[in-house]
UniProtKB/Swiss-Prot annotation:
Disulfide bonds join 47-67, 51-63. The lineage of its organism: Eukaryota, Fungi, Dikarya, Ascomycota, Saccharomycotina. Pfam families: zf-Tim10_DDP (PF02953). It is found in: Mitochondrion inner membrane. The keyword Nucleus does not apply. The twin CX3C motif contains 4 conserved Cys residues that form 2 disulfide bonds in the mitochondrial intermembrane space. However, during the transit of TIM13 from cytoplasm into mitochondrion, the Cys residues probably coordinate zinc, thereby preventing folding and allowing its transfer across mitochondrial outer membrane. It comes from the Eukaryota. Its main location: mitochondrion. Mitochondrial intermembrane chaperone that participates in the import and insertion of some multi-pass transmembrane proteins into the mitochondrial inner membrane. Also required for the transfer of beta-barrel precursors from the TOM complex to the sorting and assembly machinery (SAM complex) of the outer membrane. Acts as a chaperone-like protein that protects the hydrophobic precursors from aggregation and guide them through the mitochondrial intermembrane space. The keyword DNA-binding does not apply. Transmembrane segments: none annotated. It is a peripheral membrane protein. This is Mitochondrial import inner membrane translocase subunit TIM13.
Amino acid sequence: MALFGGSSSQAPASATDNKVQAFKQQIAQEIAVANATDLVNKVSENCFEKCLQSPYKDGNEGCVDQCLAKYMRSWNVISKTYINRIQDASTTGEI
C-alpha cells in the first residue's frame, strides 16, 4: 500500500525502461531476421533465374557468383546506411 491508503501499481522507471529497451531489441532482431530471409529469397529468385539455364554451361557458376557478390555488396551498403540513420534518429530523440 502506498501513502494515504492507495495502492502503488506503477513499476519503477528503470524497470519500465529496461522492458522497453528489451522489447526494442527483440523487434530489431526480428526485423533483421526478416530482412535476411528476404535477401536470401530475392538472391535465389534473381540470380538463379538469370544465371542457370538449361542445358547447364560452364559460365553459369561464375554468373551466380558475380550475382551473389553484387547483391551482398548492395545489401551491405543499404544496411550500413539504414543503421546510421537509425542511430542518428535515436540520438536526436526521433525514435
